[in-house]
Amino acid sequence: MSEIGTGFPFDPHYVEVLGERMHYVDVGPRDGTPVLFLHGNPTSSYLWRNIIPHVAPSHRCIAPDLIGMGKSDKPDLDYFFDDHVRYLDAFIEALGLEEVVLVIHDWGSALGFHWAKRNPERVKGIACMEFIRPIPTWDEWPEFARETFQAFRTADVGRELIIDQNAFIEGALPKFVVRPLTEVEMDHYREPFLKPVDREPLWRFPNELPIAGEPANIVALVEAYMNWLHQSPVPKLLFWGTPGVLISPAEAARLAESLPNCKTVDIGPGLHFLQEDNPDLIGSEIARWLPALIVGKSIEFDGGWAT
């Protein structure tokens, strides 16, 4: 595996969305279907820095920073999932994206799947990893992080940890990567949230994870897009790592059997932020998969046969 780069070699782009500026990466040729990269919590487009260069030679790559995150504006919002839906919907329309291939992770997956369910004719493929799915009980949440996330979801304690102590950035983020993140990388992830007042999204997201039936509205929304995924023929590319967090090897095997038109790639050792452990494999396999969306052929992936 080559050395994992820490730089962010992309010019900034901004677009006004619902009265706020959203930052995004925009590189690659303008013809053809664009590839839309969606990050989750507590990251930004920086998460895709070593993956986009594999795809950009042949496809337009767009990677926004969700509202309140990265270099995007930080309006005074509650940062419920529905707030992110409104801003992402408006972002896609502001850029005039008629059709897209989605590359999604964490809460970016929930946003992407929810958008795809509502706009199926505009989605040409979905590459996903460590995506948001219903977690029936806390017993299915990784033991090493169970108490921490239960604390995050305890009102006063959670706000103290995430807002005041910045525990999601300083604690949860590095624990969910197999390799040690460098100080340069950590500083990139810290930069948008240096002020406690800007950390509201970091607190809201773990409180909306669909675990043990709560919160009910998010559980219903996630179940709805999971039902759609199990019915839709849209090409899917699922990356998984060992041991994983949201998607274990066993869960990946079940999804490979139950999701139609789904290819899978084993990235090797990985927890939640797979992009930080094996970005070159993820990027190269996405680049190899994209032509298959047009010609419908089978490809032998480095992670094994995928058809």
UniProtKB/Swiss-Prot annotation:
Induction: Constitutively expressed. It catalyses: 1-haloalkane + H2O = a halide anion + a primary alcohol + H(+). Coiled coil: none annotated. Its EC number is 3.8.1.5. InterPro entries: AB_hydrolase_1, AB_hydrolase_fold, AB_hydrolase_sf, Epox_hydrolase-like, Haloalkane_dehalogenase_2. Gene3D superfamilies: alpha/beta hydrolase (3.40.50.1820). Keywords: Detoxification, Hydrolase. Monomer. Belongs to the haloalkane dehalogenase family. Type 2 subfamily. Pfam families: Abhydrolase_1. Pathway: Xenobiotic degradation; 1,2-dibromoethane degradation. This is Haloalkane dehalogenase. Catalyzes hydrolytic cleavage of carbon-halogen bonds in halogenated aliphatic compounds, leading to the formation of the corresponding primary alcohols, halide ions and protons. Has a broad substrate specificity, which includes mono- and di-chlorinated and brominated alkanes. The highest activity was found with 1,2-dibromoethane, whereas low activity was measured with the analog 1,2-dichloroethane. Residues 34-158 form the AB hydrolase-1 domain. GO terms for molecular function: haloalkane dehalogenase activity. GO terms for cellular component: membrane. The active site is at D106 (nucleophile), E130 (proton donor), H272 (proton acceptor). GO terms for biological process: response to toxic substance.
